[in-house]
Amino acid sequence: MTDDAAEVAVVGSYNVGLTMMVPRFPTGGETVIGRDFAEGPGGKGSNQAIAASRLGAESSFIGNIGTDRYGDEAVDLWESEQVDVTNVRRSDDSHTGVGFVIVNEEGENEITVAPGANNALNSNVIRSARPTIEASDCLLAQLEV
């Protein structure tokens, strides 16, 4: 980063996407055999923080994750992408957010999200991040948490 890099603060969610391809969506009570399973990081806020960093901004993420494997992987990802994690809170009471995505052969998807620790993002968390927010040139929020 350069001294004149923009500072971007992102308030948002982190979710792990668990994605499976299916020939068609199941109907109620039906099991459909899928293929091509993938697991990967996501969440609109997290994605924005990483994108800002990759574009040369000094990027900070403000959000909540669990104290589980997915939360550990999130911190590792952000640190490898040079996203500041000072304002990331870890929850012992809830899991890191996950999204279950099924995609049919036409490319349409159905998504179910278990937000977990994302739901603990509240005004107290935002107030504690105030110095980061005030120092930023840009604040991004997606209204999803």
Roles of regions detected by a PLM:
Residues 1-64, 69-76, 80-83:
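Glycine-rich phosphate/adenosyl-contacting loop at the front of the ribokinase-like
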Residues 1-14, 64, 72, 76-90, ...:
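Ribokinase/PfkB-type carbohydrate-kinase core domain
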Residues 92-94:
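Short, glycine-/polar-rich solvent-exposed loops and beta-turns at beta-strand/coil boundaries
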Residues 96-99:
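Short alpha-helix plus adjacent loop in nuclease-associated cores
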